[in-house]
Amino acid sequence: MKIDIKFDGKPGYGVYINELKELKFDAKVAIVTNAKVGGLYLQNLLSRIDCPQKFIISVPDGEEYKNMQTIEAILEQLFVSRLDRSSVIIALGGGVVSDMAGFAASIFERGIKFINIPTTLLAQVDASVGGKTGVNNKFGKNLIGSFYQPSAVYCETGFLKTLEKREFAAGLAEAVKMAVTFDEKLFSWMQSANLTDEANLQNLIYRCVQIKAAAVEADEREKGVRAVLNYGHTFAHVIENETNYKKYLHGEAVSIGMNMANALAVKLGLMSEEQKARAAELLVKFGLPISYKVPNASSFYEAFFLDKKAENSAIKFILPRGIGAYEIRKDVPRELVMDVLREFE
């Protein structure tokens, strides 16, 4: 299965599902991975790569290591290995690995080719597609980075067989995000489908990539419709920052963030209580958290202004309109948001 992502005036790329065979290059290749993923899949990947020289760059595992210090370490190894502008970086791992490998590729000698091979469900349905790269800092999540498209993305469902249940569920949160905002039919299907079934899983990834591809093609740099893919993330990024990226996986924080956004949508009359309950039930069915004890509602609210989606001192909220549609709102009164946050205190 293949989905083509196309852009006006410049080359696009393919997202391949269960089609990873041999990769042939006429240049040096650096594979960025971590010890856990490398131990499982690195030898398998190396056997499929035909190139003059291969280098392995291992990065620490975890969102707390997604920072400029790790980027510096990656760049240093690229220089020591004497890679150049003809070289290729391959990201083998989840969203953290692809974010960092892509960012390093975008700034190494002003940009070299990179390929994503995502090994988590979250990365396959969302993070590896679309060219967002970057790292965190003390002010918030993904505040340093670039839009830099990969040359190809290879999603292999076989890589997901070793995922822990919690990691798998975190990926399903991003799929729920797309269903709630774009596709009511997908939402209803997810309510009843056995998503551990290989065929169902492949179909889920395919549909999510279709949704993401359409948004990216229409709005590569997130000025309009692509911002909808941040549904739940405005709240989630604050939660992750408040908990030092250690308590929740990204998808878990997004799950809580979607429930918070849904509560706000109900107050604005965009969503019924019954629809909010349906969304919450699906998240809980997948073993995802939907509640968070907000330490201080005022501080939480102020943290929104560090979000990349804030524009001209206005917070941009991505909110569901029922199930299967969305609204982007920049006019939500502070007190209405505070009411939601106080409900979670």
Regions found by a protein language model. Name each.
Residues 96-102, 124-125, 238:
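Short glycine/serine/threonine-rich phosphate/pyrophosphate-binding segments
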Residues 173, 270-345:
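C-terminal charged capping/lid subdomain of soluble metabolic enzymes
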Residues 8, 103-193:
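A glycine/threonine-rich phosphate-anchoring loop and its flanking beta-alpha core
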Residues 92-94, 118, 249-252:
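Active-site nucleophile and cofactor-binding loops and adjacent substrate-binding regions
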Residues 61, 92-94, 231-232:
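Glycine-rich beta-strand-to-loop/alpha-helix junction loops that act as flexible
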Residues 1-88:
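ATP/NTP phosphate-donor binding region
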Residues 188-298:
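Active-site segments that bind and position negatively charged phosphate/pyrophosphate groups
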